[in-house]
């Protein structure tokens, strides 16, 4: 027998500190024990080293745990051994284990009352989280109440809580199957008796970035996703729209966890939620949110159509699913992916997002939702289990180890890894100092000797990281807050740390590899600087917050979709938690401008409220243990919600706070190591282990911990507690405490490591403390009973152990829900952590309070719910959601925050809807709502209207097709007949490939037949056969008469022949198989004809009636029967057929009689009706000779006498079908011809004269770039027109930043014009187009002089910035609104109507700053922001207006500026040219151009003679300012083609006026350069053209004469637009006929096409535009696209535009119910005041002396903030010296806005205060050009510098609250009662009535109150007051 090797001496070592500690001995010991399946080794009683076995070991089972529990309870110390032997008192202990360490910590806490902390340190993948689970399992076994008692089930809840966090926070990585992606502080809370009663879990830095990162090979996302996808039941999967794991971008990985069943884990997760008391509805919400995140990850985006739109979602179905689950509208959700809201200075700005940026927002949304869900789950668990006060706690700290991504698989180290590594570095430093420094310093204080062990201290690295002044974290946070770049980061780090040993920086040359490296205690880690600062800033999208959280400010009166947030209270509640910090707009608390999800925990570790420690006194059985201190707090660590901090700084503060909380605790250490990097069991990598031992300093720790004291007591306390032991050892009480303790140490043979006696305290090792305490425990009955009951008690195992794969039965645990200590959460989904509805947490959470049913829970929304909802099946779980989804939420009653408006439909509208219903009745509504996803009724109605219009268009196109292709064949059916000449043309000589031959009236294709004949008869060459081409070969094929004709009786002799003479073809003998031949085949001819008719027949011989008459005149017996021509001439001439019998056969009399096989009556018909149609006559013979005879005779005629068919191709109906198309074509060509004639103008271009008319050059801009805007503005400035008489008016439609722009459009415009960047006037209110409260808009006004190329031109900029609470495209209301702003303003100027604040500011800037009265302007010149105008164009347009006073609008020629940019632009050049020089020139003949392009046109504002308003008339403004755009027709008119519709309105309201085309006025614009943009543009143009022309057709009195009226031209234009696809298709068909079928060339059609394009070509030839030849070729090649594909695409996409959030429901009796979420708009909320009233009042209040200025006295007791109207010249801001255009000393006019005197709402406007502005006084040096002697003198522009006071003006909307104390009525007593307007009185009366008791209110009392308010006698105004009181009370 082989001898066993002796066991190693290191195998039995359980404590490393007991060795002669060296690195080698430590490694060998660890290796020996690890190989022997002993992964645990002690460093000291308070420190443990663990080597992960990478497999499950039996020592971690419940059986092993039971041994350690027994060891804990065992307290009968039997003294053994010699008293002189050192350590004789030590108990024999089990092998080191985490169970032992955890129970020791609990023992220490239980006996001392001191709080304990167990810190687990180690690299990632070393098993720290599993050690924590085992430690908690061990502690819960000894701390739970007995089964059946209160609190006995909290152990299951603790396990459930840990498992839930593990599911949502752990992931599979390359280094760890259960990698924790967050750090945890788990606090087990105990009462004074040591019973577990609470749990607090604090998360330190959750790695939220993993959610949106597609897993690299070998890794997975968070476990919860896979559990849900793999384990959800079928019904839930269907509801949540779940697929396979591979279907989701966030989950797509190639790894499968070994030994883990995701399906089973899902069941365990649900069970854990159940054990936590979470309701079924909340579980459903959690899983629904998980599914939403998965669907979010699958969203894909496509680029926009251009710079004016953001990215769009490709998979709209997925978007709808996400929107439904998140409780928001799909349109609102899609907006956050296309638009981003940022704060630029003080204004909200919108920027467009591309596909890549949209993907970033998508991922941010997913990260935000998941991290908030994780925080909510953790906080929900804490709310459930955490105590506010308790006796003591044991905390377990598990922070991730050093993270080190290799970068080889696409991953790199960034902020996440930096923060986690900093925490590990900080924790390691704390452990080092705790082990080496704290104990030594404590011993030195007590004058005890402990040797100092040198160790590696990482304080230098930590100081470099966390130095508050200049540390790395401080630098990073500072740069992040300043939004600096990556190069700035590297530069700053290089300056500060270039010589630091813990830092190295990579060169800045390669930006992609820019990085810095930190030498951590575990080795160097390289961090990439890519997006490092941006990630550190940790800014959460405010659009996401606003979308899902909504506006929670109660004072906000603006109701929007985003203002209400998610309709799902659970989702909305996530954003109401404390870990979201938000900053609001300075003028609107409801507008979030910055947000951040904090990484700092909302809770903090508990602390001891009295900083003292006392051992727990020994109590008698049943006695209640008490102490004079409590532990708790830290449950509300929320910080200011308006402070935003960076990630690194927050994490630093959180970790620092965590470590500070450990100061008063007893610390226990676990060092978890990785025996190898391959995660293989039983493999010990010596090199890796050596590195870990060194990095953690285990050798030095083992040396230092050779002296380890775990308990510290004062001398007195020790003597009192262990007095019995002292007396037992014979140590009397009389001596001093120190002497007694020294005697005890001597008697027990203790060394200094066991007991250290200091100056004030005595220090005990854990073993000695355990010995002494066990001696006391042995006398405690409670401890004895617990030990005795241990054998009868079953351990409460962890049901969620990773090594417990079998399904755990929880049936026996059902009573857990009856336990009063477990209170289920409110079954409503509204409960969790929502703002204004925080969960109620009792201050003590005592069990007695929980059992009370008198205080119900208060859930979100104020509902009281006291019932406990049990766990439901999947059907019940989602039943409410499923039923809810089946109901159309958009067709129901208005929801919260929505407004309903009712108005009536017009009769025409109702008729149209009725027609649409008739046309589309066959499409059920549920198909549109369920299948097509059209949830809203108005969208479904628009789709039906679109379909109806398309059906009408298709019908018209069908009619055109019918006329073109079908009408001819219907009138003149196609005949396949050939005349003799046509047959002759198909001879072998003339057409060898199409040789035809005729046989008895039928024509056959000889070319195809000949090869088959050669195959059958090879001796006859094909050429011989082809010689018959073009001939009649009837004689070549003799017929057997008896086989083809039955005669009169039904049979005839077989010897009867067709002719009496044998004049057949010489080759007929080869086909003669008649009866008299030797080879008789009676049916051969019939069989051959059947075959040939089927395969080779191409038609018949054709004979016209003229031919028949000619033959009849020649004596032939020919007739027509059933359109077939028959010839019986030979039969009649021969008096029958012939006879021929074979040799030897005699003919009988019957044979002779059978020669007349045709009836005499039939023969007579041919004789006497030759050349006529005998169809009727022959049919009538049936009554005479019998129908049988007639039928047989017809057969004989068809087989023997047929000559061909009747040829009707030259009949009248056929001629009509030909010439009707010709006539229509001629009409079309004639229109082109007239257009050509109208375009012919010869002669040179004359230079226009200079004019003195004032012109406004309006430039609306949206998102154009700086280059485009500068070109446009400069071109206007350079116009050869008097600079003083033109005003450049730029309207910025919204504060939006377009693609490629680095700043918003208003900022670009102001930079171009040279406005000072510091000038920032207050926004002013005005009324815009929009739904509800969207009509209230705000804008800023800037004015000044712009100098360019020697021109100095005044400008006015109106920047529409919107109200501060607008987020998406603030201020943007569309181009039509920009036009309406100017038209409204000029209309009010003309009629002196009251104006809003913005209009008054515009008036002031134009009149008092620029110096021109706005009423002087006569023309409005409209130019788009991408258009450049020729310098002579304005003069030419004005000349046309001056030449003809009846012209109301003119336009010039617009060409393409980017013609050669792409093939798309090239194909448009010729189209632009022809559309102007043909179409517009032709329309201009009639004075009615149907579309004046908005990019280059001019309108007359008023008539020159009568001063009648024209373009600014009420009619045009009223129709054009239609605010209710809710139908398909209106949207196409007002949203897609506003310029064309504006022209339509001009023609409609002023039919006597003209619109003209001025061919010599030029401008260039930018055309679409891509197919996608072109599709978008032409879709708008084509559809708006159709709808506008449809409007024009119904207008009366359009100019013109006869059929060439404008109405006719419009009709032709409309028709040509509609049938354009048919036209192209017909041309293609003609080409196909010519090329493929070989049809004859339609010469006439070719001539017409040549005429059309030839006339067009002549236009540019006459104009010497030779370059147009190439552009014409491009255009012709693109005709299929422009005239076929684009119209078809446009027609079908007619309803493809945003419908917004406005819903339209058709009610009863023609009522329309409009439901929207924009709130109601109160026009009185925008104050109005006429300029005259305002100006007169200012004159009355000011005093002017010799040009001096005296500021007026304020009428109110409060002051407005003073701002200035921006007025600049070049780069100088207003308020600085400029060159004045004219300096006048006349009395100035001040601009001050007295808001109290404007009409306003009786209640305070919601826009007062936050949107307010200021009023200020000014003195102006005006450019009043209307009264100058010489208006052409421009010398004033170049006068020397003359300083002058600058005007100040700002009309702001800042009303004081009349109810506030600061409100003081104006002093009007010097003006009397008449100075008070009725509107002021009404406002005051409303305020009085609102605050008074109506039953006690009297008119006299109201008048007294008014007198008191205004300080004047109001008796003379009594009647007015009484009337106003009655009006107010009756409303």
Swiss-Prot record:
The keyword ATP-binding applies. Residues 798-817, 1826-1847 are annotated as: Disordered. Keywords: Actin-binding, ATP-binding, Cell membrane, Cell wall biogenesis/degradation, Glycoprotein, Glycosyltransferase, Membrane, Motor protein, Myosin, Nucleotide-binding, Transferase, Transmembrane, Transmembrane helix. Residues 1875-1930 form the DEK-C domain. One of its GO terms (biological process) is chitin biosynthetic process. The chain crosses the membrane at residues 912-932, 951-971, 1220-1240, 1615-1635, 1641-1661, 1668-1688. ATP binds at residues 122-129. It is found in: Cell membrane; Cell septum; Cell tip. Residues 11-777 form the Myosin motor domain. Induction: Induced by high temperature. Repressed by the antifungal agent caspofungin. Glycans are attached at residues 510, 538, 676, 842, 1062, 1078, 1146, 1583. It is a multi-pass membrane protein. It holds the Pfam family Myosin_head. It catalyses: [(1->4)-N-acetyl-beta-D-glucosaminyl](n) + UDP-N-acetyl-alpha-D-glucosamine = [(1->4)-N-acetyl-beta-D-glucosaminyl](n+1) + UDP + H(+). It comes from the Eukaryota. Its EC number is 2.4.1.16. SUPFAM superfamilies: Cytochrome b5-like heme/steroid binding domain, DEK C-terminal domain, Nucleotide-diphospho-sugar transferases, P-loop containing nucleoside triphosphate hydrolases. The N-terminal myosin motor-like domain (MMD) does not seem to have motor activity but is indispensable for polarized cell wall synthesis via binding to actin that ensures the proper localization to the hyphal tips and septation sites near actin structures. Polymerizes chitin, a structural polymer of the cell wall and septum, by transferring the sugar moiety of UDP-GlcNAc to the non-reducing end of the growing chitin polymer. Produces a large proportion of the chitin that is not deacetylated to chitosan. This is Chitin synthase 5. It comes from Cryptococcus neoformans var. grubii serotype A (strain H99 / ATCC 208821 / CBS 10515 / FGSC 9487). The gene is CHS5.
């Amino acid at each position: 027998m082989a001898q066993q090797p002796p066991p190693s001496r290191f195998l039995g070592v359980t404590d490393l500190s007991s060795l002669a500690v060296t690195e080698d001995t430590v490694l060998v010991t660890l290796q020996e024990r690890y190989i022997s399946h002993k992964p645990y080794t002690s460093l000291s009683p308070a420190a443990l080293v663990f080597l992960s076995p990478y497999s499950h070991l039996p020592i971690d089972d419940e059986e092993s745990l039971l041994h350690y529990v027994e060891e804990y309870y065992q307290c009968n110390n039997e003294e053994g051994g010699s008293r002189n032997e050192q350590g004789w008192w030590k108990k024999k202990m089990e092998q080191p284990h985490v169970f032992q360490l955890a129970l020791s910590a609990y023992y220490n806490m239980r006996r001392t009352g001191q709080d304990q902390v167990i810190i687990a340190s180690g690299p990632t993948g070393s098993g720290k989280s599993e050690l924590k689970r085992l430690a908690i399992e061990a502690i819960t076994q000894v701390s739970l109440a007995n089964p059946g008692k209160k609190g006995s089930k909290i152990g299951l809840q603790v396990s459930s809580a840990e498992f839930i966090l593990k599911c949502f926070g752990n992931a599979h990585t390359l280094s760890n199957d259960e990698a924790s992606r967050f750090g945890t502080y788990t606090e087990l809370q105990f009462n004074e008796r040591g019973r577990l009663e609470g749990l607090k879990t604090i998360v330190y830095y959750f790695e939220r970035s993993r959610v949106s990162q597609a897993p690299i090979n070998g890794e997975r996302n968070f476990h919860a996703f896979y559990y849900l996808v793999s384990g959800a039941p079928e019904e839930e999967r269907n509801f949540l729209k779940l697929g396979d794991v591979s279907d989701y971008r966030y989950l797509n990985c190639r790894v499968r966890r070994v030994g883990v069943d995701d399906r089973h884990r899902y069941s365990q997760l649900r069970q854990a939620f159940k054990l936590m008391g979470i309701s079924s509805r909340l579980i459903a919400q959690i899983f629904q949110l998980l599914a939403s995140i998965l669907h979010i990850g699958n969203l894909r985006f496509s680029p926009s159509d251009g710079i004016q739109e953001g990215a769009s979602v490709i998979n709209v179905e997925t978007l709808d699913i996400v929107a439904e689950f998140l409780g928001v509208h799909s349109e609102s959700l899609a907006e956050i992916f296309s638009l981003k809201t940022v704060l630029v200075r003080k204004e909200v700005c919108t920027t467009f997002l591309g596909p890549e940026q949209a993907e970033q927002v998508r991922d941010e949304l997913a990260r935000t939702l998941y991290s908030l869900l994780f925080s909510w789950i953790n906080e929900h668990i804490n709310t459930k289990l955490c105590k506010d006060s308790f006796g003591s706690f044991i905390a377990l700290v598990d922070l991730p180890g050093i993270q080190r991504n290799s970068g080889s698989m696409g991953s790199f180290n960034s902020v996440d890894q930096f923060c986690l590594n900093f925490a590990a570095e900080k924790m390691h430093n704390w452990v080092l100092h705790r082990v080496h420094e704290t104990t030594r310093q404590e011993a030195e204080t007590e004058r005890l000797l402990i040797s100092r062990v040198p160790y590696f201290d990482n304080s230098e690295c930590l100081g470099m990281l966390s130095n508050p002044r200049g540390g790395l974290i401080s630098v990073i946070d500072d740069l992040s807050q300043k939004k600096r770049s990556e190069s700035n980061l590297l530069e700053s780090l290089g300056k500060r740390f270039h010589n630091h040993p813990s830092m190295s920086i990579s060169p800045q040359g390669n930006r992609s590899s820019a990085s810095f490296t930190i030498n951590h205690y575990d080795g160097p880690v390289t961090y990439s600087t890519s997006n490092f600062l941006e990630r550190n800033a940790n800014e959460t999208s405010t659009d996401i917050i606003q979308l899902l959280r909504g506006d929670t400010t109660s004072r906000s009166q603006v109701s929007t979709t985003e203002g209400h947030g998610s309709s799902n209270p659970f989702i909305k509640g996530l954003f109401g938690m404390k870990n979201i910090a938000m900053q609001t707009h300075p003028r609107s608390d409801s507008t979030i401008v910055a947000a951040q999800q904090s990484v700092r925990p909302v809770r903090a570790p508990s602390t001891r409220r009295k900083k003292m420690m006392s051992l727990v006194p020994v109590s008698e059985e049943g006695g209640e243990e008490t102490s004079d201190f409590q532990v708790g707090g830290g449950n509300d660590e929320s910080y200011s919600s308006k402070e935003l901090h960076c990630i690194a700084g927050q994490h630093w503060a959180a970790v620092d706070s965590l470590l500070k909380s450990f100061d008063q605790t007893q610390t226990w250490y676990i060092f978890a190591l990785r025996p190898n990097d391959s995660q293989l069991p039983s493999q010990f990598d010596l090199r890796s282990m050596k590195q870990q031992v060194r990095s953690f300093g285990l050798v030095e720790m083992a040396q230092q911990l050779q002296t380890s004291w775990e308990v510290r007591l004062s001398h007195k306390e020790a003597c009192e507690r262990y007095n019995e032991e002292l007396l037992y050892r014979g140590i009397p009480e009389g001596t001093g405490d120190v002497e007694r303790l020294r005697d005890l140490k001597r008697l027990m043979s203790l060394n200094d490591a066991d007991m250290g006696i200091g100056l004030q305290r005595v220090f005990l090792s854990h073993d000695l403390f355990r010995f002494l305490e066990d001696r006391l425990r042995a006398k405690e009955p409670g401890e004895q009973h617990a030990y005795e009951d241990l054998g009868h008690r079953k351990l409460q195992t962890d049901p969620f152990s990773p090594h417990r794969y079998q399904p755990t039965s929880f049936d026996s645990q059902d009573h857990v829900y009856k336990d009063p200590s477990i209170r289920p959460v409110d079954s409503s989904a509204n409960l969790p952590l929502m703002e204004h509805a925080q969960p109620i947490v009792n201050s003590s959470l005592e069990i007695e309070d929980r059992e009370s049913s008198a205080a119900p829970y208060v859930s979100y929304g104020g509902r009281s719910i006291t019932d406990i909802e049990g766990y439901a099946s999947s059907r019940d779980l989602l039943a409410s959601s499923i039923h809810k989804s089946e109901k159309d939420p958009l067709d129901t009653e208005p929801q919260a925050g929505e407004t309903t408006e009712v108005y009536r439909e017009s009769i025409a509208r109702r008729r149209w809807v009725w027609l649409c219903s008739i046309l589309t009745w066959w499409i059920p509504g549920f198909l549109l709502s369920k299948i097509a996803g059209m949830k809203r009724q108005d969208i479904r109605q628009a789709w039906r209207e679109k379909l109806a219009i398309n059906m009408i268009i298709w019908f018209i196109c069908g009619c055109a097709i019918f006329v073109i292709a079908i009408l001819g064949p219907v009138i003149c059916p196609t005949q396949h007949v050939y005349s003799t000449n046509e047959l002759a043309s198909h001879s072998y000589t003339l057409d060898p490939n199409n040789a035809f031959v005729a046989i008895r009236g039928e024509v056959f294709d000889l070319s195809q037949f000949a090869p088959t004949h050669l195959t059958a008869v090879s001796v006859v060459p094909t050429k011989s056969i082809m010689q018959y081409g073009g001939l009649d070969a009837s004689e070549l094929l003799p017929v057997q008469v008896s086989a083809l004709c039955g005669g009169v009786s039904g049979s005839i002799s077989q010897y009867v022949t067709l002719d009496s003479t044998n004049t057949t073809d010489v080759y007929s003998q080869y086909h003669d198989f008649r009866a008299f031949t030797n080879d008789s085949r009676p049916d051969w001819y019939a069989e051959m004809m059947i075959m040939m008719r089927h395969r080779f027949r191409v038609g018949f011989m054709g004979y016209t009636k003229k031919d028949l008459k000619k033959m009849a005149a020649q004596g032939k017996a020919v007739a027509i029967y059933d359109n077939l021509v028959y010839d019986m001439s030979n039969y009649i001439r021969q008096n029958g057929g012939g006879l021929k019998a074979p040799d030897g056969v005699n003919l009988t009399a019957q044979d002779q009689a059978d020669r007349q096989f045709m009836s005499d009556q039939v023969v007579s018909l041919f004789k006497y009706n030759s050349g006529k149609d005998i169809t009727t006559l022959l049919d009538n013979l049936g009554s005479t000779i019998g129908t049988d005879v007639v039928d047989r005779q017809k057969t004989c005629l068809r087989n023997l006498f047929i000559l061909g068919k009747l040829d009707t191709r030259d009949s009248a109906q056929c001629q009509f079908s030909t010439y009707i198309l010709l006539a229509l074509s001629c009409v079309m060509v004639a229109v082109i011809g007239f257009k050509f004639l109208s375009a012919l103008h010869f002669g040179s271009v004359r230079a226009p004269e200079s004019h003195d008319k004032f012109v406004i050059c309006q430039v609306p801009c949206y998102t154009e770039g700086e280059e485009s805007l500068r070109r446009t503005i400069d071109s206007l400035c350079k116009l050869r027109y008097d600079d003083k008489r033109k005003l450049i008016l730029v309207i910025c439609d919204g504060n939006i930043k377009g693609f490629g722009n680095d700043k918003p459009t208003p900022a670009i415009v102001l930079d171009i014009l040279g406005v000072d960047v510091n000038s920032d006037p207050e926004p002013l209110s005005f009324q815009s187009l929009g739904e509800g409260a969207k009509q209230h808009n705000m804008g800023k006004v800037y004015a000044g002089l712009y100098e360019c190329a020697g021109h100095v031109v005044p400008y006015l900029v109106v920047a529409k910035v919107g109200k501060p609470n607008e987020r998406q495209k603030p201020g943007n209301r569309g181009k039509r609104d920009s036009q309406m702003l100017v038209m409204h303003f000029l209309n009010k100027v003309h009629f002196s109507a009251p104006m809003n604040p913005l209009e008054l500011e515009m008036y002031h800037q134009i009149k008092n700053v620029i110096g021109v009265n706005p009423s002087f302007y006569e023309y409005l010149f409209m130019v788009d922001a991408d258009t450049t105008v020729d310098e002579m164009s304005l003069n030419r347009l004005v000349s046309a207006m001056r030449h003809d006073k009846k012209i109301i609008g003119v336009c010039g020629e617009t060409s393409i500026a980017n013609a050669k940019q792409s093939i798309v632009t090239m194909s448009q050049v010729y189209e632009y040219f022809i559309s102007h020089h043909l179409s517009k020139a032709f329309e201009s003949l009639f004075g009615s151009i149907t579309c004046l392009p908005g990019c280059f046109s001019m309108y007359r504002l008023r008539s020159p003679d009568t001063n009648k308003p024209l373009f600014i008339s009420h009619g045009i403004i009223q129709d054009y300012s239609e605010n209710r755009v809710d139908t398909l027709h209106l949207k196409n008119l007002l949203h897609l083609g506003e310029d064309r519709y504006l022209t339509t309105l001009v023609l409609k309201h002023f039919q006597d006026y003209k619109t003209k085309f001025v061919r010599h006025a030029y401008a260039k614009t930018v055309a679409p350069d891509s197919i996608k943009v072109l599709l978008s543009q032409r879709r708008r143009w084509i559809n708006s053209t159709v709808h506008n022309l449809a409007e024009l057709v119904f207008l009366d009195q359009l100019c013109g004469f006869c059929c060439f009226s404008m109405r006719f031209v419009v009709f032709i234009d409309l028709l040509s637009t509609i049938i354009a696809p048919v036209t192209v298709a017909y041309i293609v068909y003609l080409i196909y006929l010519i090329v493929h079928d070989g049809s004859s060339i339609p010469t006439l059609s070719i001539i017409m096409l040549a005429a059309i394009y030839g006339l067009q070509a002549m236009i540019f030839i006459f104009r010497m535009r030779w370059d147009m030849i190439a552009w014409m070729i491009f255009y012709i090649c693109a005709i299929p696209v422009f005239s076929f594909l684009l119209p078809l695409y446009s027609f079908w996409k007619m309803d493809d535009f945003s419908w917004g959030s406005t819903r339209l429901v058709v009610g009863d009796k023609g009522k329309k119910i409009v439901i929207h979420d924009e709130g109601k708009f109160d026009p009185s909320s925008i104050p109005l005041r006429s300029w005259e009233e305002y100006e007169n009042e200012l004159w009355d209040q000011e005093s002017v002396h010799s040009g001096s200025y005296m500021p007026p006295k304020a009428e109110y007791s409060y002051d407005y903030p003073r701002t200035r109207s921006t007025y600049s010249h070049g780069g100088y801001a207003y308020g600085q010296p400029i060159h004045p255009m004219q300096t006048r000393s006349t009395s100035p006019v001040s601009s001050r806005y007295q808001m109290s005197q404007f009409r306003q709402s009786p209640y305070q406007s919601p826009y007062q205060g936050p949107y307010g502005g200021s009023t200020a006084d000014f003195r102006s040096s005006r450019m009043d050009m209307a009264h100058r002697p010489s208006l052409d003198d421009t010398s004033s522009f170049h006068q020397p510098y003359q300083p002058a006071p600058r005007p100040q003006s700002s009309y702001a909307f800042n009303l004081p609250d009349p109810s506030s104390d600061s409100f003081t009525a104006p002093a009007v007593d010097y003006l009397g009662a008449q100075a008070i307007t009725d509107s002021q009185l009404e406002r005051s009366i409303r305020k009085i009535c609102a605050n008074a008791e109506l039953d006690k209110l009297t008119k006299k009392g109201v008048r007294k109150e008014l007198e008191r308010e205004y300080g004047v006698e109001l008796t003379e105004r009594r009647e007015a007051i009484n009337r106003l009181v009655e009006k107010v009370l009756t409303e």
